[in-house]
From Swiss-Prot:
Pfam families in UniProt: PdxJ
Name of the featured protein: Pyridoxine 5'-phosphate synthase
Self-association and partners: Homooctamer; tetramer of dimers.
Top EC group: transferase
Domain of life: Bacteria
Its EC number(s): 2.6.99.2
Single GO biological process annotation from the record: pyridoxine biosynthetic process
Residues reported in the UniProt entry to bind 1-deoxy-D-xylulose 5-phosphate: D9, H10, R45, H50, T100
Active-site annotation: H43 (proton acceptor), E70 (proton acceptor), H190 (proton donor)
Subcellular location: Cytoplasm
Gene for this chain: pdxJ
Site (Transition state stabilizer): residue numbering on this chain: E151
Keyword Hydrolase attributed: no
Length: 246
C-alpha cells in the first residue's frame, strides 16, 4: 500500500506571514499523525521562508512517524542533516525567487557533487532520495550515483489539462517502471490534490506520496485530522484504475 507523507511547510508559511508563534507546525504534525500520516515532510529552505531550525529540531524529538527533510545540496544543509539525522533526506533544486520547487534536480549534469552527498549520507545511515523529473536520463543518472530512492515530480501531471492528464500520467507510470528496473525505490509528489491523487496512488510499486498544500487547504475547512484521514483513505483504497493504456 502506498504511504502518505504530509508536508507541513504551509503551516509554517501561515505562521511566518505574521512572524508569530502560531500555528505551530510541530503541533500540526502530531495532528497529522493522528489522522494517519505515515511520515512528516518539511523543506528547510536556505532563506528560512517557512520552516525554521527550531521546527526541525522539535519535530525530530516529537513525531512518532518518519521525518523526511527536503533540502538543497549545500554545505549548510548537509551539516544540518548530518547533525539531525532525519529518517530520510530528499535533495531538491532551490532558487530564492521561486514560490515553490519548480522542477526536478538535474542529476545528470551534477552527478559528481550529488554522488559525494549521497555517499556521505548513506555512510551515516541517512537514506537519500533525489527529486527528479520522470525521464530516463535523470533516473539512469540517479541510479549511477548510488541513490536508493527517487521522488518523481508530479507537477506536470497535476497542472495538465483534462485532455493531457492521461499522457502525463503515463510518463509517471513509465517512470516508476523504469526506476524499479534500475533498482531504485520510488516516491512521488508535487501538486497532488484530492481530485487527482487516486490514479497516482494506484501505480504498482509507488511507495509514498508526499502531499501538503491540498491537505492544508482542506484542513482550513474541515480540520487537519480529518483532512489527513480523507487523503489516506483515497491512497489506501483508490476507486479509480490507472488511465486506459498506461
Amino acid at each position: 500500500m502506498t504511504s502518505l507523507g504530509v508536508n507541513i511547510d504551509h503551516i509554517a508559511n501561515i505562521r511566518q506571514a505574521r512572524l508569530a508563534n502560531e500555528p505551530d507546525p510541530v503541533q500540526m504534525a502530531l495532528l497529522a499523525e493522528l489522522g494517519g500520516a505515515d511520515g512528516i515532510t518539511i523543506h528547510l529552505r536556505e532563506d528560512r521562508r517557512h520552516i525554521q531550525d527550531r521546527d526541525l529540531k522539535l519535530l525530530r524529538e516529537t513525531i512518532k512517524s518518519r521525518l523526511n527533510l527536503e533540502m538543497a545540496a549545500t554545505t549548510e544543509m548537509i551539516e544540518i542533516a548530518l547533525d539531525l539525522k532525519p529518517d530520510m533526506i530528499t535533495l531538491v533544486p532551490e532558487r530564492r525567487e521561486e514560490i515553490t520547487t519548480e522542477g526536478g534536480l538535474d542529476v545528470a549534469s551534477n552527478a559528481k557533487s550529488l554522488k559525494e552527498i549521497v555517499t556521505k549520507m548513506e555512510s551515516c545511515c541517512i537514506p537519500t532520495s533525489l527529486f527528479v523529473d520522470a525521464n530516463s536520463k535523470q533516473l539512469e543518472a540517479s541510479s549511477k550515483i548510488g541513490a536508493t530512492w527517487v521522488e518523481l515530480h508530479t507537477g506536470p501531471y497535476a497542472r495538465a489539462s483534462w485532455k493531457n492528464q492521461p499522457l502525463e500520467f503515463a510518463k509517471i507510470s513509465e517512470g516508476v517502471a523504469r526506476a524499479r528496473n534500475l533498482g531504485l525505490r520510488v516516491n512521488a509528489g508535487h501538486g497532488l490534490t484530492y481530485q487527482n491523487v487516486e490514479p497516482i496512488a494506484s501505480i504498482t510499486e509507488m511507495e509514498e506520496l508526499n502531499i501538503g498544500h491540498t491537505i492544508i487547504a482542506r484542513a482550513i475547512a474541515i480540520g487537519l485530522k480529518e483532512a489527513v484521514k480523507e487523503m489516506k483513505e483515497l491512497i489506501k483504497n483508490p476507486r479509480h484504475e490507472p488511465f486506459f493504456g498506461s
